[in-house]
């Protein structure tokens, strides 16, 4: 019944198996990929006819992670997989980028590739298997897929490169890099790095490139045995058509490309396109040429003009040399109500960023095959149509926006402080208000500026730059800070972000074969120099984080309590914690390990909530000093309430240094006094003293005398040594910690 063909290879100690002919047999190409306990089905379908009137290749990649693959039922109200998650979108783009340039340029048939995770093994990189499976499925299909792609993941642990590291290993890795390519060339690189050098990044790419060569071999073997006949393709347009257009219109096209303004240049080129189509209207009606052929020939002429100017004259369409970077302008703090804001402008590309701080309750909950986790740092990239002067409606985030946002996220994430150093959730919203090339790298720059202005103690400023390439034969030119047209007509889009010390993110897409490591090395070095120049310009505005947070940033404190006390703080049905939140107007988040995070709009509200939590969860130490309230006066002494829920007794002999006749002559019900815990009686009740409590060095206000006052202040716990930033139970070897974020991070 089945004519199954299987090819396998041992890869990094595991067997990778590709098979076809058993599942999804009606698809033009279908491959099942197995490695460890991971199983993926990759199916490719190609329309029989070209799509009329379309000016691009309609390739769609869909990567899907089914919950059952990890033995789970989808969370939420609907127990079925819905729209693609950000992770699925990002992997779909990861598959698309190395594959798209390898189709015949004249091929415009609708093509769909679906990669479905059927079984998930966290020990194997399913995103890498999806790229391999998609490439194999297309190689079996009739689509004119000209070369075969494979991919690998590279980590860097203890100075050694690791092939296809597990999720657990990636937690300690200095690098998370995906590289894809053919037998001859690297086609795509995507990475996040912890301040690695250009040399380390290049070696990682080489390591990954060499590692996937055996995979290309077995895909070729599978395709040779099982593939279907390929579509026979003709040239994109007749050579005579291009010559005729050049003869009639090349002078006008060159004049248009001499215009430095993007909008003016685009308007002039659009008019020329209309003029050319009008000239060939009879040929279009007679079906001698199609609109697509004419447009393609025009684009080829435009490409020749742009590329020749660069290679022959070292001159770009805006007048710059290959290494020049456009003029830069930076501004910070322009949005008064935002916690942090910045505007970064580089030529005709501009990014406006706002930074907002939230509580741990505001962190993004992510449901994945590996389980649920929270993202503390969120970066949303927005590309409104007006940024390129297009009249279009605003829609849900596109795949491009998700991808660009994640690239900027990777660039910023390595330099952020950890949660102990900075306990806030951080959301960065980056709106591209103008775009003419490299808007994602402008987002990196503006995000770095906004975070520093907001007071986030980042390790170092970060900048990003997009590099391009024009290559003809052995002659090539690497372009710094590319324009949109240079990206479109060029051979490479190479984005590099990092600090002055090293790279934090790298993304490379190559459109041609033959880009060797010599070219990549030159591009990385040129990018380093460009990045340093941009950082110099940014540092003129702000070079390190502000020492204080803004006035409208919520105050926060984090303490740790015993796990056994969590239930007491929460109370039955959440009654206690709700009461604390309502009376203090604060937000409280309690982790399973006993970490309690308290957030409030000001310090007073924060203190009220914190006092109530400590009153419930913290056992006082002997020697601790508190503000207490006199609850009842007796002949022998007085009962004092402290920490809100705790009571102790002060004997008459412990009220004053001198002898007093009656307790009532000194204390009255409702008085606020300082008391020190001196011990417990045989029934466990607290014994307190008022004598010398105000003279103890631990008093928060040692100059204040312990006079009776009738103010209605909230009882406030105090510590024996206020100079020590310790928590309540440190003397008992507790791991309690308290972090107050209204402080200076830099001296």
From Swiss-Prot:
The keyword rRNA-binding does not apply. It catalyses: RNA(n+1) + phosphate = RNA(n) + a ribonucleoside 5'-diphosphate. One of its GO terms (molecular function) is polyribonucleotide nucleotidyltransferase activity. Residues 691-747 are annotated as: Disordered. InterPro entries: ExoRNase_PH_dom1 (IPR001247), ExoRNase_PH_dom2 (IPR015847), ExoRNase_PH_dom2_sf (IPR036345), KH_dom (IPR004087), KH_dom_type_1 (IPR004088), KH_dom_type_1_sf (IPR036612), NA-bd_OB-fold (IPR012340), PNPase (IPR012162). Its EC number is 2.7.7.8. Residues 623-691 form the S1 motif domain. One of its GO terms (cellular component) is cytosol. Pfam families: KH_1, PNPase, RNase_PH, RNase_PH_C, S1. Belongs to the polyribonucleotide nucleotidyltransferase family. Involved in mRNA degradation. Catalyzes the phosphorolysis of single-stranded polyribonucleotides processively in the 3'- to 5'-direction. This is Polyribonucleotide nucleotidyltransferase.
